[in-house]
Amino acid sequence: MASPFSGALQLTDLDDFIGPSQECIKPVKVEKRAGSGVAKIRIEDDGSYFQINQDGGTRRLEKAKVSLNDCLACSGCITSAETVLITQQSHEELKKVLDANKMAAPSQQRLVVVSVSPQSRASLAARFQLNPTDTARKLTSFFKKIGVHFVFDTAFSRHFSLLESQREFVRRFRGQADCRQALPLLASACPGWICYAEKTHGSFILPHISTARSPQQVMGSLVKDFFAQQQHLTPDKIYHVTVMPCYDKKLEASRPDFFNQEHQTRDVDCVLTTGEVFRLLEEEGVSLPDLEPAPLDSLCSGASAEEPTSHRGGGSGGYLEHVFRHAARELFGIHVAEVTYKPLRNKDFQEVTLEKEGQVLLHFAMAYGFRNIQNLVQRLKRGRCPYHYVEVMACPSGCLNGGGQLQAPDRPSRELLQHVERLYGMVRAEAPEDAPGVQELYTHWLQGTDSECAGRLLHTQYHAVEKASTGLGIRW
């Protein structure tokens, strides 16, 4: 069966795609008891283990478990985490929480919040032959029907991710004379790309990656910090689910950087792919078109929720286009009406330039898919990368073609993708600078655009992963 993870995770190198029987190890501390002596281990027919002590007593032994955090901290395989993901982050986990809420007293219930990505919404719209707005409203109706309390649109959190990316680029561009690694700035919204960079190129590439959080993780901050305050709840009393086009987002949500130690909770508790939401609809016996639409929820009073919104610049969030327009205006006083893309070797590697009187002022690129990412990294290593900014996505054709999106067996994949792209483009685009509620939250929640609070809640950091060298890794 083909892995649902992005190519950048599957193809890091030959040693990065191995079975857990060879190098999947977890160091554990074994407590030695004084005078315990030698013990035997008995294996039962059901596979359970029992320790038999010298005095004849027995003790059931727990099986060692490798968690998703262990996988992320390891330099071996990533795809062997798939079985862990299915149990830790799946629609079954959401159903367990909803069922527990039904049985619990009101004071013991958790507030369940679902945040839906625009890419997933477009994929579901294509499957059910709906327009994106009806899909958003009917999906809200479905989630509330099964016990979810609030349903948000991650296009709102993407406003913050785009704005922080814009500011970071301008700051780095102005400071490039003082820092060799200031540019190029590489987009950070794709977790498949981030995992690949951390595991394969480590400290060389990480300084180039934008520290701005992805829309999913900004939404995690919004829900578990701002919204929790509004609801007079601690973060652990909220169960936050996101609906994403990509399995790699499950890995992102599980990063230790997005775990609240004080309240022992993650910013995003569970990530469902578009396909998992479709299975949930099937299991509940619900046809999305048959549902009555429900009004969309908004995170704050200043944000409109009458219809879903999106951003210009393609189905992966529009990072290149928004950063390009902002930089042209902020750095050179040039208003860019239309961004013109120049395809290079393939449609997944394109360039954008800003020129004035024959001089190139800005040189941007987008690199989608593992092949183009490898080429980009090699050019960086050779010191021959001409770009100031690169929008990097692990999936060919970007997020609308993510591994978690719905497929149509009776329809060519290219034709389906084009249809999903058209539906995605039907949604009204909104400039993040002008989006209702955004400036209000910067002022009252984050205490300003460049505050310590904004840095803590809207940015993150990356960690180079050293490859472990073990005898098991020897190829005889």
From Swiss-Prot:
**Residues annotated for [4Fe-4S] cluster 1 binding in this entry:** 24, 71, 74, 77
- Keywords in UniProt for this one? 4Fe-4S, Acetylation, Iron, Iron-sulfur, Metal-binding
- What Pfam families does this protein map onto? Fe_hyd_lg_C (PF02906), Fe_hyd_SSU (PF02256)
Is Iron one of the keywords? yes
Look up the domain of life of the source: Eukaryota
Instruction: Name the GO cellular-component terms.
Output: cytosolic [4Fe-4S] assembly targeting complex
Q: Give residues where N-acetylalanine occurs.
A: 2
Q: Where are the transmembrane segments?
A: none
> Which stretch is the leader sequence?
none
Q: Name one GO molecular function term.
A: metal ion binding
Please tell me in which tissues this protein is expressed: Widely expressed.
Q: Which InterPro entries match?
A: Cytosolic_Fe-S_CAF, Fe_hydrogenase, Fe_hydrogenase_lsu_C, Fe_hydrogenase_ssu
Kindly list the positions annotated as binding [4Fe-4S] cluster 2.
190, 246, 395, 399
What SUPFAM superfamilies would the database entry show? Fe-only hydrogenase (SSF53920)
Its GO biological process annotations read:
hematopoietic progenitor cell differentiation; intracellular oxygen homeostasis; iron-sulfur cluster assembly; regulation of gene expression; response to hypoxia
Name the PANTHER family for this protein.
NITRATE, FORMATE, IRON DEHYDROGENASE (PTHR11615)
Record's function text: Component of the cytosolic iron-sulfur protein assembly (CIA) complex, a multiprotein complex that mediates the incorporation of iron-sulfur cluster into extramitochondrial Fe/S proteins. Seems to negatively regulate the level of HIF1A expression, although this effect could be indirect.
Describe the protein's quaternary organization and the partners it interacts with: External component of the CIA complex. In the CIA complex, interacts directly with CIAO1 and MMS19.
State the similarity comment: Belongs to the NARF family.
Output this protein's name: Cytosolic iron-sulfur assembly component 3
Q: Which organism is it from?
A: Homo sapiens
Please spell out the taxonomic lineage of the organism that makes this protein.
Eukaryota, Metazoa, Chordata, Craniata, Vertebrata
Gene expressing this chain: CIAO3
